[in-house]
Amino acid sequence: MRLLYSLFHCSAFLVGFTLSVGVLPIPNEHAASIKAKFDDYAEHYLLPEDFHNAETAPVKKPTDAEIESMQNSLLFEGDIMGVPEIEKSDILKRLRDDPLLDEDEIFRKPFHSALNLVTYPDKLWPEGQVPYMLEEGMTNDQRTAIAQAFDEYKTKTCVRFVPKTDDDFDYIYVKRNVAFGCSSYVGRAGGNQTVSLEVDKCFSKGIIAHELMHALGFFHEHSRTDRDDFVDINEDNIRPGMMRNFEKYPRKIIDSLGMPYDYESVMHYHKLAFSRNGKPTIIPKDNEADVGQRYKLSEMDSKKVNKLYQCGEYSKTSSTTTTTTTTTTTTTTEEPTTTTEVEEKPKDKKVSSTTTTTKKPTTTTTTTPKPVERSRNKKCEDLNAHCGMWEQLGHCQHSVKYMAHYCRKACNLCEVEVTTTTTTTPKPVPRNKEKENKSASSTTRGTSTATSTTPKTTTTTTSAPKEKCEDKNLFCSYWAKIGECNSESKFMKIFCKASCGKC
């Protein structure tokens, strides 16, 4: 993909064309193939408009009944892929009755994964970067929901979902299904691993965030070794054959990361999970607890992700820089009365005077440095993991509003470095006053005077260019004439607004 980036600049589209018998320039094979490739990348990765829509679109809160309808009884715990169906009952029986001797028996390579990094040290995504690719044909609403889930992790954790490149062997492939529920592997499974989302059921921020948290390496909260201290499992209400979805894991497989049990986790089963009669299957011991939300990452979810991936407050390197401010303490003392004779010698006469100094306060200022945290967000940086790719695809010019805010560095729209110049010009001192000061300083104790000036700071900011509604490609008129405006072409929507009447 990197080799293709340079081809997407507008200048590339002008290379090689033929003129029709009439007026419109007709693109040659090279120009047509570049348009097709642009559309291909736009299909498989999110665009600025998807994240813009994610900010304004309402976030759906699925009900317990809706969540229950997404469960797939053929999958391990309803949504976990990678566990062979034939061996589930036997494996889980031995999990209850006997310590697990060979962890690969439950998660066969290359699909095994779990939280315990002593057991599974290679199942995290390196540096918290998760390459992804989308199935083509996603609707705008589906892309918006995925963008909302990606933003949820971007806002609360250090994990980033980034466009897959040719160098990425391991990546998640987000695809749609019909009547198969929502599902994912747990952790980095190796190669192309699927996050599958049922159409009309699974495309909401919280549901997708749940499946992505599986992909990051997390099981359901009720599977924790210590879960019996926090919830009761009512077997009488569980559908026949579904008890296997309520098992606990031994510590060899699952690691709680030293975090408390979280009723509010997006990974917790809801009360009616796999219910046979509409009555609760999971009952919190805390009567006020509500479990099973699929709306957002809880505070504890975010901490778990950050701790597992050693970032945020759990980073080995501090994420903030430190500066200092000052604390001032003032103490006032009184000086004794002092009489001083001052002699002035003008050219023609001699004047003798006596100056009486009354009691006056002397101020002593003590300055103590105080550390203050400064956020990294003040730096000029891109706020979306897609910015590099978008810049190469020309979105700095064609998605101006979003890019100017979230991709300032990639689009070279950062503030010019601020330079502050302070010049202090002392006021002229009258000759007589200067002599008086010199004389006084030789006969009395010195006092210190602190003077502070407030410099003027000039900041020059490069503003984002205004977006014009015009065609950005020579061949837009031709493509519009042959009906491309009515297609799903992202290229036409971005580069051919005038010809397509989208101004």
UniProtKB/Swiss-Prot annotation:
This is Zinc metalloproteinase nas-14. It comes from Caenorhabditis elegans. Residues 317-340, 352-370, 439-464 have a biased composition (Low complexity). Residues 380-414, 469-503 form the ShKT domain. InterPro entries: Astacin-like_dom, MetalloPept_cat_dom_sf, Peptidase_M12A, Peptidase_Metallo, ShKT_dom. One of its GO terms (biological process) is proteolysis. Residues 342-351 have a biased composition (Basic and acidic residues). Metalloprotease. Keywords: Disulfide bond, Glycoprotein, Hydrolase, Metal-binding, Metalloprotease, Protease, Repeat, Secreted, Signal, Zinc, Zymogen. Glycans are attached at N192, N437. Its EC number is 3.4.24.-. GO terms for cellular component: extracellular region. It is an enzyme of class 3 (hydrolase). SMART domains: ShKT (SM00254), ZnMc (SM00235). Zn(2+) binds at H210, H214, H220. It is found in: Secreted. The gene is nas-14. Disulfide bonds join C158-C311, C182-C202, C380-C414, C387-C407, C396-C411, C469-C503, C476-C496, C485-C500.
